[in-house]
UniProtKB/Swiss-Prot annotation:
Subunit text: PSII is composed of 1 copy each of membrane proteins PsbA, PsbB, PsbC, PsbD, PsbE, PsbF, PsbH, PsbI, PsbJ, PsbK, PsbL, PsbM, PsbT, PsbX, PsbY, PsbZ, Psb30/Ycf12, peripheral proteins PsbO, CyanoQ (PsbQ), PsbU, PsbV and a large number of cofactors. It forms dimeric complexes.
MF terms in GO: manganese ion binding
Keywords, ordered alphabetically: Membrane, Photosynthesis, Photosystem II, Thylakoid, Transmembrane, Transmembrane helix
TM region(s), chain numbering: 4-24
Recorded phenotype for the gene knockout or disruption: No visible growth phenotype, decreased rate of O(2) evolution during growth at 30 degrees Celsius, 50 umol photons/m(2)/s; as light increases above 1000 umol photons/m(2)/s O(2) evolution decreases dramatically. Decreased amounts of peripheral proteins PsbO, CyanoQ (PsbQ), PsbU and PsbV in purified PSII.
Lineage of producing organism: Bacteria, Bacillati, Cyanobacteriota, Cyanophyceae, Synechococcales
Organism: Synechocystis sp. (strain ATCC 27184 / PCC 6803 / Kazusa)
One cellular component term from this protein's GO annotations in UniProt: plasma membrane-derived thylakoid photosystem II
Function: Loosely associated component of the core of photosystem II (PSII), it is not always seen in crystals. PSII is a light-driven water plastoquinone oxidoreductase, using light energy to abstract electrons from H(2)O, generating a proton gradient subsequently used for ATP formation.
Alphabetized Pfam families for the sequence: PsbY
Protein name in the entry: Photosystem II reaction center protein Y
Superkingdom in the source lineage: Bacteria
One GO-annotated biological process of the protein: photosynthesis
Length: 39
C-alpha cells in the first residue's frame, strides 16, 4: 500500500472515530435520561 493513502486516510479515520464516540456518548446519556423519566 502506498504511504500517501495511509497519510490521507488516518486523519479521516481518527476524526470519524472521535465523532462516533462523542455522538454515541451523547446518545447514551439522552437515552438514560428518557428511560429515567419513564421509571
Amino acid at each position: 500500500m502506498d504511504w500517501r493513502v495511509i497519510v490521507v486516510v488516518s486523519p479521516l479515520l481518527i476524526a470519524a472515530t472521535w465523532a462516533a464516540i462523542n455522538i454515541g456518548a451523547a446518545a447514551i446519556r439522552q437515552l438514560q435520561d428518557v428511560l429515567g423519566r419513564e421509571a
